[in-house]
Amino acid sequence: MIQVPSTLNVADNTGVKKLKCIKVLGGSRRRYATLGDVIICSVTDIIPTCSIEKGKVVKAVIVRVKKEVRRPDGSYIRFDENAAVIVDDKKEPRGKRIFGPVARELRDRGFMKIVSLAPEVI
């Protein structure tokens, strides 16, 4: 459950380390975002060689959340951190590598490129 002031780690190699959620896409009154949702974020922390400047507004897809998510078979999944992958307007990842596991829900949402780059799909 990601809402407007939430901070997220970045799970790709774009050079951005932390993001801050500034908008949840998908409706004018939508409050929370979960696995596979696209959000608008502000870049809050970067590494020195990053091509994206601090303060830049980017779109990101949520790949890991701390809050447990119920699956259709009745099982639950949760992670140790909130993490996202920066994407462009075509919903393709801007980085060339994905770090850490990603949820299987991304495949259902149509983010096949992120799923194929990830080292593990849970």
From Swiss-Prot:
Q: Which InterPro entries match?
A: Ribosomal_uL14, Ribosomal_uL14_bac-type, Ribosomal_uL14_CS, Ribosomal_uL14_sf
Q: Which PROSITE patterns does UniProt cross-reference here?
A: RIBOSOMAL_L14
User: Which Pfam families does the UniProt record give?
Assistant: Ribosomal_L14
Record bears the keyword RNA-binding:
yes
Superkingdom of origin organism: Bacteria
Instruction: Cite the entry's keywords alphabetically.
Output: Ribonucleoprotein, Ribosomal protein, RNA-binding, rRNA-binding
Q: Which GO terms describe its biological process?
A: translation
Q: Drop me one GO molecular function for this one.
A: large ribosomal subunit rRNA binding
rRNA-binding recorded as keyword: yes
Q: Kindly state one GO CC term assigned in the UniProt record.
A: cytosolic large ribosomal subunit
Q: Which family does it belong to?
A: Belongs to the universal ribosomal protein uL14 family.
Q: What does this protein do?
A: Binds to 23S rRNA. Forms part of two intersubunit bridges in the 70S ribosome.
NCBIfam families xrefs: rplN_bact
What does the record note on quaternary structure?
A: Part of the 50S ribosomal subunit. Forms a cluster with proteins L3 and L19. In the 70S ribosome, L14 and L19 interact and together make contacts with the 16S rRNA in bridges B5 and B8.
**Know the name of this protein?**
Large ribosomal subunit protein uL14
Question: What is the originating organism of this protein?
Answer: Brachyspira hyodysenteriae (strain ATCC 49526 / WA1)
Gene that encodes it: rplN
